[in-house]
A protein has these predicted regions:
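Bacterial N-terminal signal peptides that target proteins for export
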Residues: 1-7
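Predominantly soluble domains enriched in secretory-pathway, periplasmic, or organellar proteins
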Residues: 5, 20-350
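C-terminal motif of bacterial Sec signal peptides marking the signal peptidase cleavage site
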Residues: 15-18
């Protein structure tokens, strides 16, 4: 396929490439279930998507390849289902796939700014728009016609969430070790410009907002030395930032009824990973709800946490060497299933 180059007039100069790709009739997505995105290993071009059915406890591996006859790419970063379409960010391959529910490619979106390709990271969606962070310092807004606007934010933006009429973008500065960034950009959804920045802990990563827009939660990795990982909350009415009392936070995920699931990990004195622990937090009242797992299940090499539309909580476990395991929990904190993701580093369930 030869991409078509579209030159658009926006607040910043950039280029968007779009590819359409028909596929044979190979449906992989049932009436209910969850996509599992395996990030893969950097440089190995081995990201993939499988489909898990929690009712049948069945898993169809590499469903994207089955639908399209091509590999997904290098380092799968995020997956979003919105308005009957699936969006997949492939970071190192610097592309976004837009597919139907069976993972058949409808569009492939490659963005440029100032003559350089951009690397997509994390999605959010609101008001018929899909937003995506680009690691080169931009937030993108994708419209239904696949046109794209860009807004310059801070260095190496990662997570993004919507609270009220604003987008909150975590500027990690992840490529500037050991002098990481420590800001969150506040971007208006109306003007699509950066309105302000808020200082937080260094190396901010994931963002989640309460449904009433009152609170925005930010997890950060710290500098891996004297500044530890943290979970903080921004009160949007006054941009105040408060530390929450969770230790070694590695990932967060917003669930139903404004419950925030907090995955905490860490290492022993010999740098061996400790089993993950999950806590719950009420996002609307900003109050702890205690431990999540109620049946004693342990989570070795915990890597990621997601809450899917099916209501189950998915925890990806990975040693970065062999195929990962995914633990599936009910909202009551009991293990529903465990399966081999048949890929490296299961990073997201949706």
């Amino acid at each position: 396929m030869k991409p078509t180059k579209l030159i658009l007039s926006i607040c910043l100069t950039f280029t968007l490439f779009s590819c359409e790709s028909p596929a044979e009739d190979t449906p992989v997505h049932g009436s209910s279930g969850t996509y599992i995105l395996n990030s893969g290993n950097w440089g190995d071009n081995d990201a993939n998507i499988g489909f898990y059915n929690p009712t049948e406890k069945s898993f169809a591996a590499d469903a994207f390849y089955a639908a399209n006859g091509q590999k997904l790419g290098d380092v799968g970063q995020d997956i979003l289902v919105y308005d009957d379409l699936v969006y997949v960010a492939i970071n190192t391959s610097q592309t976004i796939f837009v597919t139907d529910s069976d993972l058949k490619i409808k569009k492939q979106l490659d963005a440029e700014a100032d003559g350089a390709r951009l690397s997509p990271r994390v999605f959010a969606a609101h008001g018929n728009k899909v937003y995506v962070t680009y690691y080169e310092g931009y937030l993108g807004e994708i419209s239904k016609d696949y046109s794209l606007r860009l807004c310059a934010v801070g260095p190496n933006p990662d997570g993004v969430a919507i609270a009220g009429d604003n987008l909150y973008v975590a500027n990690s500065g992840g490529m500037s070790y050991p002098t990481y960034n420590n800001t969150v950009s506040v971007v208006s959804t109306d003007s699509f410009t950066e309105a302000s920045t808020i200082e937080v802990n260094v190396n901010p990563a994931m963002v989640a907002a309460s449904s009433d827009g009152k609170y925005v939660y930010i997890s950060s990795f710290g500098n891996y030395a004297d500044q530890p990982a943290k979970l903080q909350v921004i009160t949007t009415s006054n941009a105040g930032v408060t530390d929450l009392e969770y230790q070694s936070v590695s990932a967060i995920a917003k669930g139903k009824n404004d419950v925030l699931y907090i995955l905490c990990g860490g290492y022993d004195e010999n740098w061996n990973p400790l089993p993950g622990t999950i806590y719950k937090h009420d996002m609307k009242t900003n109050s702890p709800l205690g431990a999540f797992v109620t049946d004693g299940t342990t989570l070795p090499n915990s890597y990621s946490i997601s809450v899917a539309a099916d209501g189950y909580i998915y925890v990806g476990c990975s040693d970065y060497k062999t195929t990962g395991d995914v633990y599936v929990f009910s909202k009551e904190g009991k293990l529903h299933d465990k399966f081999d993701s048949q890929g490296l580093n299961p990073i997201k369930a949706f």
